[in-house]
């Protein structure tokens, strides 16, 4: 089932329309990005413009490099790469071997916000390395090239305090032959790894993605706190996320059309899975592929309350070749520590009925509250 997300009026998404308290992310992130005193506002029409703006912000007035950046940035992106996205859509199996395209934000800790205008689009990714205090909003990422070069849409490495909000990320949930595992399609939508923590992923529309996202790079990269809320995952294969250790709070998400596995809690991680809507999903909550060091979960007030609901919502399960744990009894296997931030989740039914009006791009950053559920 495809969720058709309605749009608000087209045109520029004005910075003046942004909430004044960007730090209220509804999750572990507490960043204002570049929305702080002393910020410089720039407009970018292309990927290269964004690269140039960020590199310029690393230098002082005398052209000397400043550690962590010279000033905070607010970058408004108004480019349109629909033609590249359409060409990639018409040549899915040719994208893997192409050069990856992306903006790398490296060693920039002064704060940066990248926000797309309504109607903008990108056939390139944004990759964060050893930075902090970054916000990415209202960006539409489609059919990233360069899967063989780790061409993620959003990659967060060694970067704490990040907010990924109101974006659309899409490709084709499809396998092309060509490698030993027959996986020559696209890389991840959002990978969060290498000691990155305090990240909030909210109000994104992610569809047609095979490998949605990592939480952790390896069995030793396990210490992080992440929140996923009010996201729509539609026609996706797996990794919602693939969680290696740490803590994940997933609330008010809509999971539909999961073709392999959903929240995969591994390496003794724990997930609080709260007031979500699951439908047409295979292995929506599981711990698999490791064979040991299983993670645990606390299931709280989702639309599924017991195995008696599986048939109603078309929830199915299968086995793994290694030892595994599925939530086939739909019982909690752990207790999540108290959540250190305030949040106001709506009912799963409201998520099902209303979230499409708020998640994704061109929504002027609107949020879903209980008042909108009636």
Swiss-Prot record:
Catalytic residue positions: 239
**Signal peptide location:** 1-22
The pathway it acts in is: Glycan metabolism; pectin degradation; 2-dehydro-3-deoxy-D-gluconate from pectin: step 2/5
Q: List where in the cell it is found.
A: Secreted
Residues recorded as binding Ca(2+), renumbered to this chain, are: 150, 152, 187, 191
Might you give the EC number(s) for this enzyme? 4.2.2.2
GO (cellular component) term, any one:
extracellular region
Q: Entry's InterPro entries?
A: Pec_lyase, Pectin_lyas_fold, Pectin_lyase_fold/virulence, PEL
Q: Which keywords appear in this protein's UniProt record, sorted alphabetically?
A: Calcium, Disulfide bond, Lyase, Metal-binding, Secreted, Signal
Q: A GO BP term, please? A: pectin catabolic process
Q: Which top EC class applies here?
A: lyase
Where, by residue number, does the polypeptide cross the bilayer? Answer: none
The similarity comment for this entry is: Belongs to the polysaccharide lyase 1 family. PLADES subfamily.
Name under which the protein is recorded? Pectate lyase 3
Instruction: Identify the species of origin.
Output: Pectobacterium atrosepticum (strain SCRI 1043 / ATCC BAA-672)
């Amino acid at each position: 089932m495809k969720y058709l997300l309605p749009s608000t009026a087209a045109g520029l998404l004005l910075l003046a329309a942004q909430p004044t308290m960007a730090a209220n992310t509804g999750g572990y992130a507490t960043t204002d990005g570049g929305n702080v005193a002393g910020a410089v506002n720039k407009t970018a029409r292309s990927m290269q413009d964004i690269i140039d703006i960020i590199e310029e912000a690393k230098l002082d007035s005398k052209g000397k490099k400043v550690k962590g950046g010279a000033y905070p940035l607010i970058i408004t992106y108004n480019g349109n790469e629909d033609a590249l996205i359409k060409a990639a859509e018409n040549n899915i199996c040719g994208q893997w071997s192409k050069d990856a395209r992306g903006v790398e934000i490296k060693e920039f800790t002064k704060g940066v916000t990248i926000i797309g205008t309504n109607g903008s689009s990108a056939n390139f990714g944004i990759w964060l390395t050893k930075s902090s205090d970054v916000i990415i909003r209202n960006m539409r990422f489609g059919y990233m090239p360069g899967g063989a070069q780790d061409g993620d849409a959003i990659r967060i490495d060694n970067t704490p305090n990040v907010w990924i909000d109101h974006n659309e990320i899409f490709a084709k949930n499809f396998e092309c032959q060509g490698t030993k595992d027959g996986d020559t399609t696209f890389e991840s939508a959002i990978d969060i790894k290498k000691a990155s923590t305090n990240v909030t992923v909210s109000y994104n529309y992610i569809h047609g993605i095979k490998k949605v996202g990592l939480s952790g790079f390896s069995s030793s990269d396990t210490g992080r706190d992440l929140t996923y809320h009010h996201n729509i995952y539609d026609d996706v294969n797996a990794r919602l996320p693939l969680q290696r250790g740490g803590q994940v709070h997933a609330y008010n998400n809509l999971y539909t059309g999961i073709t392999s596995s959903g929240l995969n809690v591994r390496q003794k991680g724990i997930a609080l899975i709260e007031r979500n809507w699951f439908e047409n999903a295979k292995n929506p909550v599981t711990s698999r592929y490791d064979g040991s060091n299983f993670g645990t979960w606390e299931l709280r007030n989702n639309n599924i309350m017991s195995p008696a609901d599986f048939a109603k919502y078309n929830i199915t399960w299968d086995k793994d070749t290694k030892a595994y744990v599925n939530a086939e009894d739909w019982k909690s296997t752990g207790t999540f520590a108290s959540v250190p931030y305030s949040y106001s989740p709506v009912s799963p039914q409201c998520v099902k009925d209303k979230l499409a009006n708020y998640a994704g791009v061109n929504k002027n950053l609107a949020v879903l509250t209980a008042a909108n559920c009636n």
